[in-house]
Amino acid sequence: HLEVDKIWHLACPASPKSYQLNPIKTAKTSFLGTYNMLGLARRVNAKFLMASTSEVYGNPELHPQPETYHGSVNPIGIRSCYDEGKRIAESLCMDYKRMHGCDIRIARIFNTYGPRMLPDDGRVISNFIVQALKNESITIYGDGSQTRSFCFVEDMIDGFILLMNSNYMEP
């Protein structure tokens, strides 16, 4: 018997390089991991916080995206194991809230960076840093007018704690 009052569900590789190595495992981690943790939250009446992602918006046609935006997604693309996995995980969270009264929180993370970030994880910050350190040209995809939201890891943790301790239960 496990006694907990808060569950912090942060499991799932977030680096494209990592989640594309085993896309089936990535999707299973999002779905089954969330399902199992929500079951535990329901059994022990624990608050539940799930780390989701900005990737639930897919390739958004609206910038910046409000939480009410439903996105523009590709359910069968090479990134879909991560994007769709997080979308179904959010759906499960909201269904457990509606059907079982679970006390859930969903944090949609955008481009976190900080110490011990792997230099080859395939995300923009690490790519920029590695290229700059090698005195290489910085790779910009598109025409350079794109925008991204970045969050320092310590700020993200502070946000998680504030969200878990709040009464806010929407993404």
Language model: regions and residue ranges:
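N-terminal Rossmann-like NAD(P)+-binding domain of SDR-like oxidoreductases, especially those catalyzing
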Residues: 1-112, 132, 142, 153-167
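Short, solvent-exposed loop/turn segments at secondary-structure boundaries
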Residues: 21-22, 116-121
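A general alpha-helical scaffold signature found inside nucleotide-binding enzyme cores
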Residues: 29-32, 123, 127
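Conserved loop-to-helix N-cap of the C-terminal "lid" that shapes the substrate pocket in Rossmann-like
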Residues: 106-109, 121-126, 137, 144, ...
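Activation segment of eukaryotic-like protein kinases
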Residues: 127-133
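A glycine-biased structural micro-motif
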Residues: 170-171
